[in-house]
């Protein structure tokens, strides 16, 4: 989740929600490590190969939050992972090169 979406989601909840229990903020989209790797490679222009060691544990089988509560309140994330990573990389190049 992009920090801008996170900040907007928190402000939205402060203005529109005062109940219990908790509310999850997120994109509501699940992604594999391989998919994330491909997006990062594209964002930074890496054309090499990547290798995955399938003998290692893969951690939690599902890595997604249920965002239906905040979505039903009318809030949805706006910045997808492709744009967020691309923007972050451009910012990095402009500020640290």
Residue ranges with predicted function:
Residues 1-97:
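C-terminal substrate-binding subdomain of Rossmann-fold SDR/epimerase-dehydratase oxidoreductases
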